[in-house]
């Protein structure tokens, strides 16, 4: 709010000031007003720079008012602070700025220091700082040093301008290390006269003064002003501040602006004064003539004497520059063609040479020749310079500096004033005022808006390259955006720009191409290796891309090929990506080849570094480039894929085994490819039929790696099988320990299998599901082989069962061996012991085998789960494939692999060994008490209860060795064998066993005893299982309880077909069972029936 009030007060002050001046100048208070040089009316004078006090004093005196002196008086007093004239001694000037000095010290001021001779030591009293009675300091006394050591204005005046400028230049260099901008030069031909940048700079300043003089701002500074300016520059260099300097810098007046620009352009004050005085002298007597319409070099040659130079060498150098400028502006680079004026151009060249030759003549003759030549030169030069161009009126503009390309080179030097002399990376605070002032030179230099924006953008951009200040780059972009396209330009400007052409290296180049093509080339060079030049991907890269795109469009439109070009921003971005990726990849590859790789293959390191490169590219650079090319990431990824693929292919072609190099390179290459594909799909989607995917040649690392892994698996599986053979041959079927009641061979087999599995998953190479499936099948086969070895020497349980006795009917005589009906009984009878030599293992050995196989099947399940978990961890996600055929190949492994084959074989082996063990115990170990002597001579004298103790002994031996999970399984087999033995006794007990219906009750009791033995009060087998098994014996026991007549009637009621098919009768038994029951009856009715019906022979009497 206070700032707004201050602005309003300032505006009101300026309005009131102008009204006061208008009143005094328009009225009769001033007798005569003398205009400053270059001004015709008061409208040409900036009243804000006229001293009101000077005008009031002239009005009081009643004298003439010289506005030039009023302007000088205004600038001479502007640096002094305001004070009212009350005459009090308490008024003083502040030597510092209060706002920047901070708060006043809270301590008491120190006492007045005592000046002592240098030979005596200085004694200080520390109590002075705390003494309240210390006298206050006088305002004129200093804390720093005696007055004899201070610099006075006269001392400052002794500094030469050139020395000051050198010091300032050195200070600038010390603050900033300039970048090399040697490549960034406009594509313009050199000048025929050999004029230098210094010549252009000095002439540009002369033009600026002439144009400023047209607005009445040209005055010659006084001696006092010179001293004040020198003092201000020294204070700046010393880093000190003063109120007067601050106010001078904030001045927006034309005079101070020109003074500031003089320093910016490194023009000495002596030259400035010479030029100002010369221009003022040239304009004297030319009533109504504007200073900017003068032919400046000619007028200065005429009005500036050699006596104004410190030495003749400086004068000759100055004169040579003026003559060269006339030659360049009127002959070499004229804005208007000569036509019929060609002779005048020749005369002009001759006169210029004669003026230069006059300096070598004696003084009198030289002066005469120079004066004559200057007179003739004026006639010829003025006639050439005032030829009309672009429809202007004769005399309106003096065409001597607006010829291309001289004009743009001069304007470029003027534009350099916008940079701060002490910080060339910043624009000066007066940049807007400078640009506004430079517009006054447009008429003289023939500058249009398009030329201005182009040159200004060039100057800003080149300064950015030198200083690396991003702010300058942003300003340059703003100016580039202001350059109008062809259709946005007016017809006159379009026609004018079309004529601005020059030849460089036998190539015709337009104005825009001269300035924009170097910018474009520089931007292309930077972006063509953006990984190197924009290491951190700063915002500068985004601005550089903007510069490249703007200049590319402008140059494309300027070129004749613009109408036929189909190039776009996308193609430009792709060219940058292509170049930068190639350069970076090449550097990276060379660096890896030259580095110490610690025995790691260079392709593996290259893949890792390439992945890092792509991560940096996608996160830092691509967000910038994607603004103009949405699929730039896909292009970059496809390019990197190709570059690395070219390096990888020879290695893949030569890979035949899983060597250390292969194990190092394969995963790195596959990981890189998958990362690149993920980046591409993130931009292009899941559809892999896009243009960038089509160009990809897949590495197929996984396929090659899988093939090599399969070879390794096959070799390992052969090793496992040989180890299985070896382990089995060394197996003695002794328990390892009471806790580990299985054979040592299975432990060895699992050890080698697990080692192989560990090695498989330790292979850090890409794999497919096919390789895992092959490993599963190989291990499955190994355990099937092991199981077959266990079972190969185990006999059939039927070999343990003794031959079934011949069926005979009851009679007290020797049984005769006969054949029964063919349709009922087999013709082959075994009445002798089988001759097969059977190796019957011990029960403990069979139990160890059972435990071993159970351990195998249980560990297989754990191994299976472990392998799948490790596989899932190894392959956490579905891979992206480039070709659909690869997807189809992978579909062959859909279901989850397992050890189903070996598991099935082991379970079958467990069942067989259990059955064998039960049969062995009943029919071998308990054969005599069970099979041969049970129920002999009758049921009551040999009951089953007598066998329970022997069964319990066998059962205890089983349970002491067998593992807990197998207990019920083996006991169930023993129950089945016991029931088989009991049926054998009841149905095939031989001629010595007879059963009466009255004994069925005893038999039922025996069956119940056997059942309860295996149930064991709940500690044995489940009751339901035992009941189901005992059911078949109960039926036979029940048949033994029927009367003979009932059995015979049931047999007679059946047809022959039913008998052949084994159908059951009303008693629930088949024919064979009923016949066998009748064979064990000791009554004549059964014997007669069996003799008549089945021809069964009689037994021994």
From Swiss-Prot:
Membrane topology: Peripheral membrane protein
Function (record text): Controls the tethering of the proton ATPase AHA1 to the plasma membrane. Is essential for stomatal opening in response to low concentration of carbon dioxide and light.
Any Gene Ontology CC annotation: cytoplasm
Database matches in Gene3D superfamilies: 1.10.357.50
Protein name: Protein unc-13 homolog
Tissue expression profile of the protein: Expressed in roots, cotyledons, leaves, stems and flowers. Expressed in guard cells and mesophyll cells of leaves.
Family assignment from sequence similarity: Belongs to the unc-13 family.
Gene Ontology biological-process entries: protein localization to plasma membrane; stomatal movement
Subcellular location field: Cytoplasm; Cell membrane
Boundaries of every MHD1 domain copy: 663-804
Record's keyword annotation contains Membrane: yes
């Amino acid at each position: 709010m206070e700032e707004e009030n201050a602005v309003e007060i300032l505006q009101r002050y300026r309005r009131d000031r102008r009204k006061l001046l208008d009143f005094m100048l328009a009225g009769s208070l001033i007798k005569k007003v003398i205009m400053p040089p270059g001004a015709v009316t008061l409208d040409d004078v900036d009243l804000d720079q006229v001293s009101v006090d000077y005008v009031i004093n002239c009005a009081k005196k009643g004298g003439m008012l010289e506005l030039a002196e009023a302007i000088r008086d205004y600038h001479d007093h502007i640096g002094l602070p305001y004070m009212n004239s009350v005459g009090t001694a308490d008024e003083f000037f502040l030597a510092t700025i209060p706002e920047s000095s901070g708060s006043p010290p809270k301590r008491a001021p120190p006492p007045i220091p005592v000046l002592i001779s240098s030979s005596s030591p200085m004694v200080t009293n520390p109590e002075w700082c705390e003494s309240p009675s210390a006298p206050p300091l006088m305002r004129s006394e200093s804390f720093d040093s005696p007055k004899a050591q201070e610099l006075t204005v006269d001392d400052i005046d002794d500094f030469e301008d050139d020395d000051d400028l050198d010091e300032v230049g050195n200070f600038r260099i010390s603050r900033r290390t300039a970048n090399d901008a040697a490549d960034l030069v406009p594509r313009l031909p050199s000048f025929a006269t050999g004029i230098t940048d210094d010549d252009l700079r000095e002439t540009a300043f002369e033009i600026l003064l002439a144009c400023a003089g047209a607005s009445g701002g040209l005055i010659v500074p006084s001696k006092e002003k010179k001293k004040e300016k020198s003092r201000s520059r020294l204070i700046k260099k010393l880093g000190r501040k003063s109120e007067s300097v601050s106010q001078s810098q904030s001045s927006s007046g034309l005079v101070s602006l020109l003074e500031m620009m003089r320093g910016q352009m490194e023009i000495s004050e002596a030259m400035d004064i010479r030029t100002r005085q010369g221009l003022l002298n040239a304009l004297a007597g030319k009533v109504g003539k504007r200073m900017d319409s003068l032919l400046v070099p000619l007028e200065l040659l005429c009005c500036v004497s050699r006596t104004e130079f410190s030495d003749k060498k400086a004068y000759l150098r100055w004169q040579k520059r003026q003559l060269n400028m006339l030659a360049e502006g009127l002959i070499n680079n004229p804005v208007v063609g000569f036509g019929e004026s060609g002779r005048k151009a020749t005369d002009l060249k001759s006169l210029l040479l004669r003026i230069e030759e006059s300096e070598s003549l004696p003084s009198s003759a030289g002066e005469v020749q120079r004066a004559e030549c200057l007179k003739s030169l004026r006639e010829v030069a003025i006639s050439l310079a005032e030829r009309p161009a672009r429809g202007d009126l004769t005399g309106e503009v003096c065409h001597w500096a607006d010829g291309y390309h001289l004009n743009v080179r001069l304007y470029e030097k003027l534009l350099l004033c916008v940079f701060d002399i002490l910080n060339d990376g910043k624009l000066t605070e007066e940049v807007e005022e400078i640009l506004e002032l430079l517009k006054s030179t447009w008429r003289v230099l023939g500058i249009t808006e398009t030329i201005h924006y182009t040159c200004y953008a060039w100057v800003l951009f080149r300064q950015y390259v030198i200083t690396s200040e991003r702010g300058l780059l942003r300003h340059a972009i703003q100016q580039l955006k202001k350059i109008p396209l062809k259709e946005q330009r007016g017809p006159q400007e379009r026609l004018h720009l079309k004529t601005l052409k020059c030849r460089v290296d036998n190539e015709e180049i337009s104005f825009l191409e001269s300035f924009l093509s170097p910018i474009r080339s520089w931007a292309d060079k930077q972006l063509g290796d953006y990984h190197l030049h924009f290491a951190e991907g700063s915002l500068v890269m985004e601005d550089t891309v903007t510069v490249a795109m703007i200049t590319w469009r402008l140059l494309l439109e300027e070129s004749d090929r613009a109408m036929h070009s189909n190039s776009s921003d996308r193609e430009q971005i792709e060219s940058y990506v292509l170049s930068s990726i190639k350069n970076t990849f090449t550097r990276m590859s060379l660096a890896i080849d030259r580095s110490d790789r610690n025995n790691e293959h260079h392709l593996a390191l290259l893949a890792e570094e390439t992945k890092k490169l792509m991560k940096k590219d996608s996160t830092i650079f691509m967000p910038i480039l994607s603004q103009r090319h949405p699929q730039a990431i896909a292009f970059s990824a496809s390019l990197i894929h190709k570059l690395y693929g070219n390096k990888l292919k020879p290695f893949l072609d030569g890979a035949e085994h899983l060597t250390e190099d292969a194990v190092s390179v394969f995963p790195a290459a596959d990981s890189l490819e998958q990362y690149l594909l993920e980046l591409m799909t993130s931009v292009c989607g899941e559809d892999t039929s896009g243009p960038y995917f089509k160009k990809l040649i897949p590495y197929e690392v996984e396929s090659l790696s899988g093939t090599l892994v399969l070879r390794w698996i096959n070799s390992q599986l052969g090793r496992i099988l040989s180890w299985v053979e070896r382990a089995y041959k060394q197996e003695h079927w002794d328990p390892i320990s009471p806790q580990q009641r299985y054979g040592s061979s299975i432990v060895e087999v699992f050890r080698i299998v697990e080692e192989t599995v560990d090695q498989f998953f330790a292979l850090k190479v890409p794999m497919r599901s096919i390789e895992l499936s092959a490993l599963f099948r190989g291990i499955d086969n190994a355990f099937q082989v092991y199981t077959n070895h266990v079972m190969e020497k185990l006999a059939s349980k039927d070999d343990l069962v003794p031959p079934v006795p011949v069926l005979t009917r009851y009679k007290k005589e020797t049984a005769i061996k006969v054949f029964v009906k063919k349709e009922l009984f087999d013709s082959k009878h075994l009445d002798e012991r089988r001759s097969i030599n059977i190796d019957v293992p011990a029960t403990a050995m069979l139990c160890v085998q059972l435990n071993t196989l159970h351990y195998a099947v249980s560990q297989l399940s754990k191994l299976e789960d472990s392998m799948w978990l490790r596989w899932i961890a190894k392959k956490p996600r579905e891979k992206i494939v480039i070709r659909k055929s690869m997807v189809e190949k992978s579909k062959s492994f859909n279901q989850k692999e397992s050890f189903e084959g070996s598991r099935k074989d082991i379970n079958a082996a467990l069942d067989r060994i259990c059955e064998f063990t039960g049969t062995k115990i009943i029919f071998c170990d308990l054969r005599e008490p069970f099979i041969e002597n049970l129920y002999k001579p009758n049921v009551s004298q040999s009951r089953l209860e007598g066998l329970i103790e022997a069964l319990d002994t066998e059962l205890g031996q089983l349970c002491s060795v067998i593992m807990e999970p197998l207990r019920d399984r083996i006991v169930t087999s023993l129950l089945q064998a016991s029931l088989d033995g009991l049926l054998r006794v009841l149905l095939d007990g031989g001629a010595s066993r007879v059963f009466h219906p009255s004994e069925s009750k005893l038999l039922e009791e025996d069956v119940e005893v056997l059942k309860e033995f295996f149930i064991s009060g709940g500690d044995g087998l489940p009751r339901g299982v035992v009941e189901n098994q005992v059911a078949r014996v109960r039926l036979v026991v029940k048949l033994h309880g029927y009367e003979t007549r009932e059995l015979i009637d049931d047999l007679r009621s059946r047809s022959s077909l039913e008998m052949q098919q084994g159908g059951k009768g009303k008693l629930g038994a088949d024919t064979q069972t009923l016949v066998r029951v009748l064979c064990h009856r000791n009554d004549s009715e059964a014997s007669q029936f069996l003799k008549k019906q089945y021809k069964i022979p009689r037994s021994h009497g």
